[in-house]
Amino acid sequence: MLWTDKYRPKTLDEVVGNNKEKALIQKWVDNWKAGNPQKPLLLVGPPGIGKTTLAQAIAREFSEYIELNASDKRSQDVIKSTIGESSSSKSLFGDDYKLLILDEVDGIHGTNDRGGVRAIGDIIKKAKHPMILIANDFYSKRIASLKTKCDVLKMSKVRSPSINKLLKQIAINEGIKANPAALKELAKKSNGDMRSAINTFQALANQNEVLELSDIENITTKDDRSTIINGVTAVLKSKNPNHVKKALMVEEDPTLVMEYIAENIPREYTKKKEIKKAYENIAKADLYFGRARSSRYYGYWKYATDFMGVGVSDAKDETYKKFTRITSPTVFTLMGRNRGKRNLRDRIAEKMSQKLHISHSVAISMFPYLEIMFENNELAWEISDFLGFEEDEIKRFRTRKIPKKVIEKMEKQKAQKRVEQRDARAQEIQDGLMATIPPQKEVKEEPTEEIQEEVVDEIKEETVEEIQEESQKEVEEKPKKKTDKQVSLFNF
């Protein structure tokens, strides 16, 4: 079990550091519990200082909580269908509030997360439950629109004495022999990152019987990993490979870092051959990122990072002394969106190719006709249903959504057709089974049965007088028999 999980604080008081912010958060919680709705909290600060832990500790004071983090797909539709519905619906436990946690909102990027920040802003306006948003970079443009809608709390790094105190307690609990100087140095090198300090301590404790100062001095730290700007600046301004590699240890999506570097190359480099060589390395980095995505082998990231970092850095003949303002991606963002459009086109063509048994090029040539056909709501639904189009694929051919009434109508028709097809198939099976039954032989009637029937018919033809005559004879015979019996008795 990881020590970060084992020693994770369970309450707000157990969270180390940021005492002033904790007091404000407790007041925020108390107001919600008293029935006074508050603006969402936006916790901003470096990784590893306990923002998520703090939010989860707060969650224990509410009836339930829902969390959406960086590992989840966070597109506009996903956020609205999960957090959006929960933000306005009642808790499972009655009238109590439920806490909604959105982690790493500044990390929402790429095709899968497009529209996510806008969806969060819409949810905040309608939310009836407390919300906590978490971000790493206070200056990220992605959260600029969210700052005005939230109460922003800037979380500070945990002080090294506080980290050292916790490491000592863990050493006692786990029975680890550690030199106090080693723990003090580890706390200092963690640069305020409590999680990093605990993970490093556990890794070293598993390798050494006694933790010494020399063990700590040999480890690398994560200093200067605060912003993406530092990493991009190092790539463009430095020619020292070690410095560049260390500077690129940023808590950001590496493809985004690559786009930042690519955007700012012509702002820093002035020679054509330098710019050409730098972009060749960017192309190679992008190639390895693509291989990593397609193969799901993320070991390719190392090669991609080397090309976009050391490769671009080495492309210049000398360092430039001028000041260069690092800007966020614009051209490469558009290129990325175009790449997304190409991927969408290829997905659609692949589905058409499989269903219609045509080539990709023929499928793509049909797109203009599909745009015309998709103007009809019912036809758009039928084509989408047949080809298995998803929502973003439908949007390729029409900007408007298919009306809900049309969808419900077409789904009912489809369900009715399925029932009819099932009944027809069932009838075919029944007819097939009946056809396998062998023909039955005719059963001949017994002669005795015919005779009995004739006798019955003769009886039916007898007249009433004949029946009366027979009954009269029976009456006359009975007394005679009785007299005979009496004579014989007297003779005896």
From Swiss-Prot:
<feature type="region of interest" description="Disordered">
    <location>
        <begin position="462"/>
        <end position="492"/>
    </location>
</feature>
<dbReference type="InterPro" id="IPR003959">
    <property type="entry name" value="ATPase_AAA_core"/>
</dbReference>
<keyword id="KW-0067">ATP-binding</keyword>
<dbReference type="GO" id="GO:0005524">
    <property type="term" value="F:ATP binding"/>
</dbReference>
<keyword id="KW-0235">DNA replication</keyword>
<protein>
    <recommendedName>
        <fullName>Replication factor C large subunit</fullName>
    </recommendedName>
</protein>
<feature type="binding site">
    <location>
        <begin position="45"/>
        <end position="52"/>
    </location>
    <ligand>
        <name>ATP</name>
    </ligand>
</feature>
<dbReference type="GO" id="GO:0016887">
    <property type="term" value="F:ATP hydrolysis activity"/>
</dbReference>
<feature type="region of interest" description="Disordered">
    <location>
        <begin position="429"/>
        <end position="450"/>
    </location>
</feature>
<comment type="function">
    <text>Part of the RFC clamp loader complex which loads the PCNA sliding clamp onto DNA.</text>
</comment>
<dbReference type="InterPro" id="IPR003593">
    <property type="entry name" value="AAA+_ATPase"/>
</dbReference>
<dbReference type="Pfam" id="PF00004">
    <property type="entry name" value="AAA"/>
</dbReference>
<comment type="subunit">
    <text>Heteromultimer composed of small subunits (RfcS) and large subunits (RfcL).</text>
</comment>
<dbReference type="InterPro" id="IPR023935">
    <property type="entry name" value="Rep_factor-C_lsu"/>
</dbReference>
<comment type="similarity">
    <text>Belongs to the activator 1 small subunits family. RfcL subfamily.</text>
</comment>
<dbReference type="Pfam" id="PF21960">
    <property type="entry name" value="RCF1-5-like_lid"/>
</dbReference>
<dbReference type="InterPro" id="IPR027417">
    <property type="entry name" value="P-loop_NTPase"/>
</dbReference>
<dbReference type="InterPro" id="IPR047854">
    <property type="entry name" value="RFC_lid"/>
</dbReference>
<dbReference type="GO" id="GO:0006260">
    <property type="term" value="P:DNA replication"/>
</dbReference>
<keyword id="KW-0547">Nucleotide-binding</keyword>
<dbReference type="GO" id="GO:0003689">
    <property type="term" value="F:DNA clamp loader activity"/>
</dbReference>
<feature type="compositionally biased region" description="Basic and acidic residues">
    <location>
        <begin position="470"/>
        <end position="479"/>
    </location>
</feature>
